[in-house]
Amino acid sequence: MINGHGNNIQGLQHLLKADFSTNVFDNPQTGDLLDYLQTQLRAIRNYPDSECRLLREKLADKFNLSPGYILVTSGSTEAFYLLAHAFQKQCSAIRTPAFAEYEDACTLYNHQILFVEDLNELNNVKPSDLVWIGNPNNPDGRYLRPQQLVAFLEQNPKRLLVVDEAYIDLCEAAESMASLVGQHQNLVVIKSFTKLFAIPGIRIGYLLAHPQIIKKLQACHMPWAVNALALKAGEYILDLPEQPTVALDHRLQESKRMQAELAQVAGFRVFPSPTNYFLCELEQATAAELKKQLLKRHGFLIRDASNFRGLRPGHFRVAAQNKTLNNEFIHALKACINAIQPCLSYPSH
């Protein structure tokens, strides 16, 4: 449900200089993709392939799986709702803080929901049927290596582990679990084209799982759920040759630099992240007030993360931009913190 999400910039353009709230990556190749889609507009005159066969074949080649392991969805969020629907009224454990749609989807389909901060906690709580994690996680960038997740799969053969890898391409030295779904029947991996190519408006994602799970999900999937241009976009992206990741590497280095510099600010906590985004916490002020002041005084937008389950009023998320903007943001952030922290506070828990 959209209320669980972050910023809506439609009414803020007149104030906005730079958006540090969004954790998509402005890939240099996105312009070429948009040019290509301009040449494919006639595709909307026909119904799209309801089975997404060409895109599934390309994904199967990429991950060395058969197409029967793949379901293409209208963005990764649709995959969450399909899973919750197919396994309705079961018990789901969600590692927090987490993307709100895991909980929203499970609530909609009457799951009993457990919240844990670490997978190890599951040994001490009522057994769950499904376990949901972001890897890397949103909003804090936590990342678990495949070896850790494989160990969990082997120790919990009756639990279905749902791994959301929407941000895996924006995580330093990360390894996907996608190719392992052929070895573990209790593994579901959800992926997206959105974050690396900055195309959230196209709505194209996919899910990888054992064919028995895929068939269960297909029974809940409405016909023509993925539109023709979204399919064209996915096919185009998968046909791109491997490109040097210089721009992304620079962005990740900038994220590290920002984290290190902001960690030195008094009354301010930075949660280390290997991604282009990271979580912060103000000790004596609210993220809502900081967001207001940053936008009003400097035109910078951050993500108030206080509505993530388990987080506090001082939590907010930052996504690194280019070096010039990042330097301006750091200066602005320090100025705003100095202005608001002496007079604002909230109770500790």
What residue ranges belong to the model's regions?
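Short, conserved charged micro-motifs
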Residues: G31, A285-K292, T324-E328
